[in-house]
Amino acid sequence: MKRRWQEKRKAAGKSIHEPGPNIVMGANAQVALEKFARYFDVETRLVPISEERKYCLDPKKAMEYVDENTIGVYVILGSTYTGHYEPVKEMAAHLDEYEARTGHSVPIHVDGASGGFVAPFATPKLEWDFRIPRVVSINTSGHKFGLSYVGVGWVVWRSKEFLPKDLIFELHYLGSVEYSFSLNFSRPAHPIIAQYFNFIHLGFEGYRQVALADLKNARLLSRALENSGLFTVLSDIHRPAKGLLSSAKQTVGFDEENVENYVPGLPVVSFRFSDEFRQKNPDVEQRWVQTLLRAKGWIVPNYELAPDMQDVQILRVVVRESTSAVMIDRLVSDILEVTEGLAKADSPMHALNNLQSRSTVEGHHGKLDEGSGSKSSGTYAKQC
């Protein structure tokens, strides 16, 4: 996108340095998106998130950050924080109107790192891909819901015109003509072989069954947490889609197994203490749940939402193909046990409060000294 923007600017006799290119994304963007902007000298324009817009990119607000130097807009198919899909079609509509009004065409890149292997199989009717003309490129990670090893990722362009030829290298010394478009050089083949095996072995229907099972278990976890009264669930995959009533009891013929009846999203469950629990237990810190669950063998991170909502902390569970209904039952039991234990004044779990002032070698291991990293630019990327 940057190279195509440069070519257009040069053709129009305009500078490519002043004021320089920018890219627009929600403040909830994954760190890889911010890395691109920093490494390739592109100004990052972060759109504030809000509860009303499901902690994701607000297309209408995003247009306040778009101008003739915007090389593109990142739209995320599966927010790292809550698993929500950002509205690709809505964003495209705003950019269509902008082009009609100004003559400036701003493309969309869909970051489908996780959703790229969920949405096409679980909700194929959802329009987020090349069915939308303004989407020019899509990426996804094979090592997430693609079920491959770490190290394989994919990027697909709408057509050859969106990948400038001068970015492609032609190699002749490997016994045949090879074409390369990559930032790394020698790399292992096993992740790609594993990905290819899954493509052949599972096929469309296999990936669909995996995605549907993941979402079903994620809905099970979401409902269990909400019904406990101890937590508020921020993710929405267990809620009926717009236009459907909120309860199967209120809806004649509601099919609880049909994924199309629910808000689309990743099989991710993000939750926090309910307001009622906080009022009754003001001294209990949510981050203690993470620590206690780790002692039981669960890795459930607790972290702040993106800027503008950084006062809200959430716990997050990613449901994958290895997660069964039995595991969900055990996880729920452990979450409720540690949470209820923290609420009891005579519980040993309150000893956590006394541990906060202690520092351990384990707690410091692998961390940089405070201030060693660059200043946070707004996304959730923070110093290790």
Where are these regions (language model features)?
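Conserved PLP-enzyme active-site core in the AAT-like
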Residues: 1-169, 173-177, 181, 190
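Non-catalytic terminal extensions of PLP-dependent enzymes
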Residues: 9-12, 92, 202-384
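Generic alpha-helix detector with strongest preference for long hydrophobic helices that associate
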Residues: 18, 43, 72, 136, ...
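Generic structural hydrophobic/aromatic packing signal, biased to beta-strands
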Residues: 23, 44, 108, 138-140, ...
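Catalytic cores of large soluble enzymes that bind and process phosphate-bearing ligands
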Residues: 25-29, 54-57, 79, 83, ...
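Generic preference for well-ordered alpha-helical elements
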Residues: 30, 85-88, 192, 218, ...
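Noncatalytic linker/hinge segments flanking ATPase motor cores
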Residues: 66, 114-121, 149-154, 177-184, ...
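Active-site C-terminal subdomain of aminotransferase-like
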Residues: 120-267, 271-278
